């Protein structure tokens, strides 16, 4: 029997609060993986990420998860240097990894995205976006139907390792043959050697009021997800009820940035000045865990204690793959 110990509620953390972008690949560039593990293993890892995207779509279909999946993701360049790097990346992924990204110049991008801020885009038709909390809850429902036991509000306070590891909570314990640690930024002392490998980073997102279908689709005509390539990036997409969801800003503090709603609204207006009469109706945030090089970190602590963390903002598809 599989038992899940959840410190809060299903989807309380990054799995429910994230921006909803499901992207093939990882938080680092492929050349980082090549330096870490070699070209052959880097190719294998990239193919794993493609498999993770296929797995995500199959799970949505198999379990009839109503999470508003939409195809298409664009990584956009603001500065000429970024434009050159993105275009070279499109060529490299096609030639060396057999991955068919599309390069859009400024005019081609402008046909789909009503913003003059960007110089070009790498468009990935295989990636896309979804409602993250609906997806997380759908996976939980499928797990329950398969016989998994889920205990919410059950934070683990101690992991006792051994032939049969034990996880203690404030109200009881679970003894298991195998343990998977998937707490990301919230391990809270149960595996210090893992916590030292990642850093929690706050990221924030807001939603406008419903704009109406015509106005919303005038912003992103093909309904793709979009992200720029800055370190503290902007990312955005449309929701099923025709809101613009606009995220970005990074915080390395335990507190959200002051004046967050105003800051996020100004960032949105910088991309879409035609929304100068629109503010963000809701703003929320949460913490992702990133590694120093943004490469994912998963493996085993002991022969029967596994871990998966450090997805660095690219966990929607690749976490499912890591679990598999």
Listing of model-derived features with the role each one plays in the protein:
Residues 25-106:
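Dinucleotide-binding Rossmann-like beta1-alpha1 core, especially the glycine-rich loop
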Residues 22, 54, 58, 62-70, ...:
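Active-site substrate-recognition segment that forms the wall
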């Amino acid at each position: 029997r599989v038992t899940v110990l959840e410190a809060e509620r299903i989807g309380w953390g990054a799995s429910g609060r994230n921006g909803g972008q499901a992207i093939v690949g990882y938080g680092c560039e492929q050349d980082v993986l090549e330096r870490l593990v070699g070209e052959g293993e880097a190719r294998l890892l990239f193919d794993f990420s493609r498999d993770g995207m296929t797995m995500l779509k199959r799970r949505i279909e198999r379990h009839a998860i109503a999470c508003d999946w939409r195809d298409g993701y664009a990584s956009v360049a603001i500065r000429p240097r970024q434009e050159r790097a993105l275009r070279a990346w499109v060529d490299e992924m096609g030639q060396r990894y057999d991955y068919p990204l599309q390069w859009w110049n400024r005019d081609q991008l402008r046909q789909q995205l009503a913003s003059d801020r960007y110089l070009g885009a790498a468009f990935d038709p295989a990636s896309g976006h979804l409602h993250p909390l609906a997806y997380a809850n759908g996976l939980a429902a499928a797990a329950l139907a398969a016989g998994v036991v889920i205990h919410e509000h059950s934070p683990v306070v101690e992991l006792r390792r051994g032939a049969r590891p034990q996880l203690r909570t404030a109200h009881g314990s679970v003894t298991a043959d195998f343990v998977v640690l998937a707490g990301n930024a919230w391990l809270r002392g149960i595996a210090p050697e893992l916590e030292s490998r990642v850093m929690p980073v706050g990221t924030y997102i807001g939603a406008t009021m419903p704009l109406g279908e015509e106005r919303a689709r005038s912003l992103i005509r093909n309904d793709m997800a979009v992200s720029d390539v800055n370190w503290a990036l902007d990312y955005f997409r449309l929701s099923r009820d025709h809101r613009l969801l606009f995220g970005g800003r990074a915080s390395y503090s335990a507190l959200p940035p002051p004046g967050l709603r105003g800051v996020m609204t100004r960032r949105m207006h910088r991309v879409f000045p035609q929304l100068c009469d629109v503010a963000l109706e809701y703003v929320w945030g949460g913490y992702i865990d990133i590694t120093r090089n943004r490469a994912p970190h998963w493996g085993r602590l002991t022969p029967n204690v596994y871990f998966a963390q450090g997805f660095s903002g690219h966990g929607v598809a690749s976490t499912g793959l890591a679990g598999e």
